[in-house]
Curated annotation (Swiss-Prot):
Oligomeric and partner information: NDH-1 is composed of 14 different subunits. Subunits NuoB, C, D, E, F, and G constitute the peripheral sector of the complex.
Name of this protein: NADH-quinone oxidoreductase subunit D
UniProt keyword Translocase, yes or no: yes
Organism phylogeny: Bacteria, Bacillati, Actinomycetota, Actinomycetes, Streptosporangiales
Pfam families found in the cross-reference section: Complex1_49kDa
Length: 434
């Protein structure tokens, strides 16, 4: 008789019997409800599948994918420079961080990280810190709206407008800028930008003080946020959670300090931390981060020395200062003369045409670059096969990773606490689904 070589498993019994027995012993009915994807208190098109035992959440699952746009796949059919117009639309509240992470990865592949002009790096840092401020204000505004505090919502969006006005002045758009490019930035700061930023530095501390008055000692806000959605350092590290959630649990991990990029090692700032590990602690960390961002921006203005804002290699860098003709159509003669060079070379114009239409070629290889976005570690993994287009680009979006913590934060709490928990994560579904 031949001994069976396969392993046979009895499908009955084991853990499943325990689950059935527990359900039979339960005196209450379990209710499964869908919160979202079109619920007024969820961030974007996020679907939460909650199992309730009365008011208590016994199981929380996250349903994503409702905002899938195929950005990563589409980038495989565009040039490396055109990729910035795609990545800026992922997490649409932090577009400049998306662009920077992508461009840092491309610059690593090209081997030009150290050739990016100093002025371009200072502008990148300043724009990112302004973006951090605007993102945190949206986080607090939407959180207030979801808890019914409409004054917090209106104030948060009002403060954000100050930042968006600067973005519009510099890039021409309030969102989806495509301003940061491989090798530098699209163009220099327009006249009046420094004065506009200094106005923000003067006014913003007063606005922050008003926001603190609304929330810091508000008994209703404290009741809804303290000891709610608790997640300690161990839980954060096990789930890969980064950003304000991790720092609110007591670990001062910030890529700007741990793995500096764009010259962050030359700036003086602190990493706000808390040991509360709850919703209230995350709010306090975000408020403190806004203050540190203002400190960094002030240093940026002092470091803004005259100079180029795009790498000088003509095979990579586009002309950084575009100008329209007097009729409002086409490029100005001065701009075309700049492209063609002093001798009016037709070859230079042809090269420029090929650079814009075909793009530059990137040597074969792989590179990963990460930045500290307002939500956490935002990483870009880029693969080149030596062509003018990416072979593969993949992003580690912090909202996607941090949403894994929903179950740990919500199970055992109440339905009302689910709203506070998700809002404290501050996910943006454009970055989650991509």
């Amino acid at each position: 008789m031949t001994t069976p070589t396969e392993t046979y498993v009895d499908a009955s019994g084991g853990d499943w019997d325990e689950v059935v027995a527990a359900a039979q012993r339960s005196q209450t009915d379990r209710l499964v409800i869908n919160m979202g994807p079109q619920h007024p208190s969820t961030h974007g098109v996020l679907r939460l599948i909650l199992t309730l035992d009365g008011e208590t959440v016994t199981e929380a699952r996250v349903g994503i994918g409702y905002l899938h746009t195929g950005i990563e796949k589409n980038m495989e059919y565009r040039t490396w420079t055109q990729g910035t117009t795609f990545v800026t639309r992922m997490d649409y509240l932090t577009p400049l961080f998306n662009e920077t992470a992508y461009c840092l990865a491309v610059e690593k592949l090209l081997g030009i990280t150290d050739q990016v002009p100093e002025r371009a790096n200072v502008i990148r840092v300043m724009m990112m810190e302004l973006n951090r401020i605007s993102s945190h204000f949206v986080a607090m505004a939407t959180f207030g709206m979801e808890l019914g505090a409409t004054t917090v919502m209106t104030n948060g969006f009002r403060e954000r407008e100050m930042v968006l006005d600067i973005f519009e002045m510099v890039t021409g758009l309030r969102m989806n800028h495509a301003y940061i490019r491989p090798g530098g930035v699209a163009q220099d700061l327009p006249p009046g930008t420094v004065g506009k930023v200094r106005e923000l530095l003067t006014e913003m501390p007063k606005r922050l003080k008003d926001m603190r008055k609304l929330l810091d000692a508000n008994p209703i806000y404290l009741a809804r946020t303290r000891d709610v959605a608790y997640l300690d350092v161990t839980g954060c590290l096990a789930l890969g959670v980064t950003g304000p959630i991790l720092r609110a649990a007591g670990l001062p991990w910030d890529l700007r300090k741990a793995k500096p990029y764009c010259g962050y090692e030359n700036y003086e700032f602190d990493i706000p931390v808390s040991d509360g590990a709850d919703v209230y602690a995350r709010y306090r960390v975000r408020m403190a981060e806004i203050e540190q961002s203002l400190k960094i921006i002030e240093q940026c203005l002092d470091k803004l020395k005259p100079g180029p804002v795009m790498i000088e290699d003509p095979k990579i860098g586009w002309p950084a200062q575009l100008a329209l003709g007097p009729d409002g159509m086409g490029n100005a003669p001065s701009h075309i003369a700049h492209i063609m060079g002093k001798g009016g070379s037709m070859e230079a114009l042809i090269h420029h045409f090929k650079l814009v239409t075909e793009g530059f070629r990137v040597p074969p290889g792989q590179a990963y670059a990460a930045v500290e976005s307002p939500k956490g570690e935002l990483g870009c993994f880029a693969v080149s096969d030596g062509g003018p287009r990416p072979y593969r680009v993949h992003f580690r979006d912090p909202s996607f990773t941090n949403l894994q913590a929903v179950a740990a934060m919500c199970e055992g709490g109440t339905v009302a606490d689910v709203i506070a928990a998700v809002a404290s994560i501050d996910p943006v579904m454009g970055g989650v689904d991509r």
